[in-house]
Amino acid sequence: MGDATATEVFPVMDSIAVAMGDVESQLRVFHNVSRFLPTDDANQVFWWRTTGRHFAIMMHEARYSEARQVELLLFYRFVIAPRLGPRPTSATPWFHSRVAPGIGDGSPIGYSWRWGTGPDTKPLIRHYIEAIGPLTGTTADPLNEFAAKEMLYQLGQLVPGVELPLAWKFAAHIRPSLTDEPTRAVAGSSILIGLQCAPESAGIEVMAGLMTRSPAQVPELLHSIFPRAMRDAYGPDASLDGLNMVRDFVCHDPQGQYLTILGTTAIDCCAAASSRFKVYVTTTNTSFAHLAAVMTLGGRKPEAPESLTQLQELWYALKGLDPEFPVTAEPLSSVCGAANGTASGNPNANVSGVTFYFDIHPKYPFPHIKLQVDISKHTISDLGAINAVTEFLARRGQAADAQAYLNVVRAMVPDEELRTRRGLQAFFAFAFKNGAVDITSYFLPQIYRRYAEVQAELEPRKDCQGRSELSSKLQRRSRFDSY
């Protein structure tokens, strides 16, 4: 692209009308499916008309086939929506979900959109949920694990290829015993569920996110708990080389010693031959030299120079840095860390706004590494962060799918909110694949943070004679009107 400007490579950025997409076409499959769905449970209907609609727009913009859209919408309505709990009755969640801790507003679901590394790939959509059940928020279930375990069990029965033995084994090793007061004092959500809904697949891939809330366990994860869990899950002779490489870097490398282990892991719910588990860390250093050192494990893991160049371009764009800014210097941040200036209600160990995870399996000599950037700590607005990434994608030949993502987020919140607030965009994640940066967006429905706006969209205004009167934002058709 040479010296082309962002407007030249991405001209659609100048047109909100174009970027908003065609609401009717975005929701056509959603409305057709909705005609035949039950409406007797108000809680499930609420989640369907809000988050189900978001999912429909995502799939339309990601070019999923209509058959796949119908299949996944039915899965969403009958498997996911019933496990999202009661509909909100105020802007304060009755139970604060651990989805996107420190960033989320308590909504029990979040989304991700993965672009891939070239123009021939389709976006890949995932959901991350905390299952809500009858015991959630009670003293009978302080870790909120019963609803999640029930859901995982049902997914194992319902979805071909889902296997749970590794998840159960890892969970047993990191589950706190709750036998001492310090552990009970921090007890909270312990299981999240990831659901990958690929465009071309006939199935759904499942991941179990496991969180220990025991302060005594976290320092022992790398040294004793994860090694025992690996041998239990993969077999007594399973190679620990990948885990040992991570531990060596964290404990002995000068750059690794900036890292702090988080009490979190995640397990692919599939056969042991391909199921990986994740080790999450956060850092106190935000210089690009440090980020690059972690992504290569201090040179232990070879990566293409072009990958590192692309990562630097993205990091500098997100931070608004001059290209000549020294890679060894830490950029200053004047951004308030709370989304929209409000605290989420959950403590967040990720003070710097940067986390990494290492994907490990005994058969791989190196872990797969992903960098996650908390947008609320590094950019002024959601749109500023989104533009930094989508303009990079456009220059790389992925302008259509970059625009598709803009269509999704602009269908979820007004453009003015994207320009002036933070809260929809949670993270951007970056990994190396085939000599390029593989980018994933993590974003949030903001059901509680935008409670008033959501209610207004669900219930159009009445005129002085009691007739429905749609707001200007909802002209053509209410975005939630499905029945």
Swiss-Prot record:
At the top of the EC hierarchy, this enzyme's class is transferase
UniProt GO molecular function:
prenyltransferase activity
User: According to its UniProt record, in which pathway does this protein act?
Assistant: Secondary metabolite biosynthesis; terpenoid biosynthesis
Pfam families annotated for this entry? Answer: Trp_DMAT
User: Is the keyword Transferase in the record?
Assistant: yes
Q: Which family does it belong to?
A: Belongs to the tryptophan dimethylallyltransferase family.
Q: What does this protein do?
A: Prenyltransferase; part of the gene cluster that mediates the biosynthesis of viridicatumtoxin, a tetracycline-like fungal meroterpenoid with a unique, fused spirobicyclic ring system. The first step of the pathway is the production of the malonamoyl-CoA starter unit for the polyketide synthase vrtA. The aldolase vrtJ may be involved in the synthesis of the malonamate substrate for malonamoyl-CoA synthetase vrtB. The polyketide synthase vrtA then may utilize the malonamoyl-CoA starter unit, followed by sequential condensation of eight malonyl-CoA units to form the polyketide backbone.
Protein's name according to its UniProt entry: Prenyltransferase vrtC
